[in-house]
Amino acid sequence: PDCSNMCHESSGFALSDSIGIGKGTVKLEDFNSASLILVVGQNPGTNHPRMLTALRDAKKHGASIISINPLIETGMKKFKHPQNPLEMLGSGKSISDRHVRININGDMAFFRGLNHCIVKNHNYDLNFIGEHTSGFEDYKASIESVDWDQIESISGISRQEIESIAEIVSESKSIITCWAMGITQHHNSVETIQEMVNTHLLGGHIGRKGAGLCPVRGHSNVQGDRTVGINHIANPSLIQNIQNS
């Protein structure tokens, strides 16, 4: 094992299976074009402090930010940029517009309920789905009926709040979802991440400016590792091409 598979191995499997590439789909500049940013199972102030600057700048450009996390992190409530004297003298800038205090590993149930609401209210991009996805009818049938008692119990979030957030998601023109160890370190992490991906695929929030998926890495050059094929289980085609060369 190395830094490329200790943390986001589940992200790599989930994304490769769902969208054909095992890494994020956004650039840093996309944050300034997003209308909604979901920060799920991640504590930027503690583990990715420089990301707070990107989130603050995104808010300046009009983005709404929803934090979905059992922990209410101070950095998401107030942020003072250490290189800005005026901010250091002030009370700080609010980062998160809304905090959803979910149960530990309640994310799958939460996004399942969220996607149910989106499908039920027909708030999906049928053109994008038809051109860029497969299996929609089967997925739609599987999610048209959900057990709300179970979703509320597992997620710790009320049906009313999930429906409220689904409405925000449906009204947003471009969405970025970020996640880290709070998502990836569970036995069902792959399924949870794929349900998050489904939220993006339903609305066409991928492959365009200001929208996409952002697994937030922690170690240096993990993204680069995967780009050049470094893995503890090497891709056979990579090995063959190296041998051929």
Residue ranges of predicted features:
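Cofactor-pocket helix-loop regions in the catalytic cores of large enzyme subunits
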Residues: 1-220, 228, 242-245
